[in-house]
Amino acid sequence: MGNPENIEDAYVAVIRPKNTASLNSREYRAKSYEILLHEVPIEGQKKKRKKVLLETKLQSNSEIAQGILDYVVETTKPISPANQGIKGKRVVLMRKFPLDGEKTGREAALFIVPSVVKDNTKYAYTPGCPIFYCLQDIMRVCSESSTHFATLTARMLIALDKWLDERHAQSHFIPALFRPSPLERIKTNVINPAYAAELGQVDNSLHMGYSALEIKSKMLALEKADTCIYNPLFGSDLQYTNRVDKVVINPYFGLGAPDYSKIQIPKQEKWQRSMSSVVEDKERQWVDDFPLHRNACEGDSELLSHLLDKGLSVNQLDNDHWAPIHYACWYGKVEATRILLEKGKCNPNLLNGQLSSPLHFAAGGGHAEIVQILLTHPDIDRHITDQQGRSPLNVCEENKQNNWEEAAKLLKDAINKPYEKVRIYRMDGSYRSVELKHGNNTTAQQIMEGMRLSQETQRYFTIWICSENLSLQFKPYHKPLQQVHDWPEILAELTNLDPQRETPQLFLRRDVGLPLEVEKKIEDPLAILILFDEARYNLLKGFYTAPDAKLITLASLLLQIVYGNYESKKHKQGFLNEETLKSIVPITKLKSKAPHWINRILHEYKNLSLSEGVSKEMHHLQRMFLQNCWEIPTYGAAFFTGQIFTKASPSNHKVIPVYVGVNIKGLHLLNMETKALLISLKYCCFTWQLGDAGTCFQIHSMENKMSFIVHTKQAGLVVKLLMKLNGQLMPSERNS
């Protein structure tokens, strides 16, 4: 806990899990936790408030842990039922943080107080009192520059988020953190008054109608030994071996205070059976709690299939952090393994609590047929290692169980076999097939390395997952193949779309965080080509809203790039038919503007071809196209979908579906139907705030004092990207 004399200011993070399942997960999810925060007014701004952690002062001469627990109880009494307060399980010092301002040179400690799992208890809202917030919602908007949090609180929350992520990777740490405190685990404490040294020791203990002195006298009078045996070794210098010959477990331990009138001492031959009953109870409880695991152990294919039809999760971990497939592979149940993989769509690389995979279990047990099934799975990671850095082949050769030689041969042969491949598309429709050396464990960074781009070019692009109406950018450590598999769940979480109509594909696209100043310095022809293809795609789809003159210039450049120099005999007015216009003019302008633009486009095309000062090298023309696009507000934006409400009349509202574009310049709203630019705001000109439950966000324009709310399930992603891109800007760039 540290030296209490050096600690004065203490901040307290009271956290609770939303359900017990999250305690056994090796993967950290912020949405599985809630945290207790205060809301306090911002100085000088009465209506605005910021969130802070609970804060207290520590008394150097008091017991720190108990003092903090008492403080939490007192602080939360107004919001809890029956004024009981929230009782923490223990107090953990996470780390100390240096203070700023007047307190420079001093430190504040952050203590973590784990609480009980969230239940149906209703906590009352009381102004000035703390309330629980979803940790994921908090972390989405948390940064040291955010006005929603005190700076020190933001710093502590970011550190707490990282700390929880690290602790989830440690076996048994999280279950131990939220385990009941030692005092809670003591059911009954009875002091034998015959051995009480002081009368005070038996206060509040079991009372039989006698004082401690009277009971002690009675027991001493009754304690008469018929036989006395001395231990000859006790107190002597003789050597002896300290060993346990027998362990006897009291089968009634932990069952509560018994009714002594009903207890019958069993006969000696029944003692062994009573001891085993405790183990039997635990096994029976495991069978009841984890039926899928039990049937995977036993290899009951029919019942296993039936349970999967009922919707039981193949990824659920039991108390030992094992999934059903781990048991099936450990016990050599071939058909059960096949059903879990094929019908249950189980991840073949699913790790248990000790970071061992199904392939490790099958190889360690020498189950060659299961090894074969796993190795032929398209998503398998042949090079996977466990917590000790061992491959499945290492485990197989160490254990030498059953048919281990055949299993080892299969593993050796698999190393040299061709890998499964995945198509990574570009925005022009072309693609490159990339080997998946680690199956569905392959990261976005590893796929980028397989694209055979130079290190310099890789900086400008990243891997995206896109379907018809949703596009998401991966971080380097994300595993794209797993996201493709989970796409229906992702769609359900972020949209109201029908998953059957949304087929995900992986794309190589511009990194949304790429600064324009960096892009303007790119000279590599391949990088320019990839950027050009993406810009052209977005232009034709109507995402680049610009004046007519700009769109006509871009159309003439596309004609020069696609058809070469202008020829009067070949490129007459009839040359620009409807099909040709589709390839050079935004879809939103085809009917309304394109027919009237034909002469202007041909005129600019002719002037461009005849201009001697313009290089006709392909990458130079493509760069000119990009230079014109850089001036468009929505260039390089990531687009999300949402809705805004406007007053159609005093009595009702009109719903307008919109695209929400976020780029290095700011935020932009486009009418989803017409692609008209409704609003475009630079970072210096607006503020934003995530709404409750993460289903909307509010925008306030500082120029015209206008505020509006965008309703979207993607609000958390939008706000997080706004914070990231705004944080990248230099102060001078924010106003440009």
From Swiss-Prot:
- Identify one Pfam family in the record: KRIT1_FRMD8_FERM_C
Q: Where is this region: Interaction with RAP1B?
A: 430-452
Gene Ontology cellular component? cell-cell junction; cytoplasm; cytoskeleton; plasma membrane; protein-containing complex
- Keyword annotations from UniProtKB, A to Z: Angiogenesis, ANK repeat, Cell junction, Cell membrane, Cytoplasm, Cytoskeleton, Membrane, Repeat
The record's listing under InterPro entries reads: Ankyrin_rpt, Ankyrin_rpt-contain_sf, ARM_KRIT1, Band_41_domain, FERM/acyl-CoA-bd_prot_sf, FERM_2, FERM_central, FERM_domain
Which tissues does the record link to its expression? Expressed in heart, brain, spleen, lung, thymus, kidney and testis. Isoform 2 was more frequently expressed in the thymus than isoform 1.
The record describes the protein's role as: Component of the CCM signaling pathway which is a crucial regulator of heart and vessel formation and integrity. Negative regulator of angiogenesis. Inhibits endothelial proliferation, apoptosis, migration, lumen formation and sprouting angiogenesis in primary endothelial cells. Promotes AKT phosphorylation in a NOTCH-dependent and independent manner, and inhibits ERK1/2 phosphorylation indirectly through activation of the DELTA-NOTCH cascade.
Protein's recorded name: Krev interaction trapped protein 1
Lineage, top ranks: Eukaryota, Metazoa, Chordata, Craniata, Vertebrata
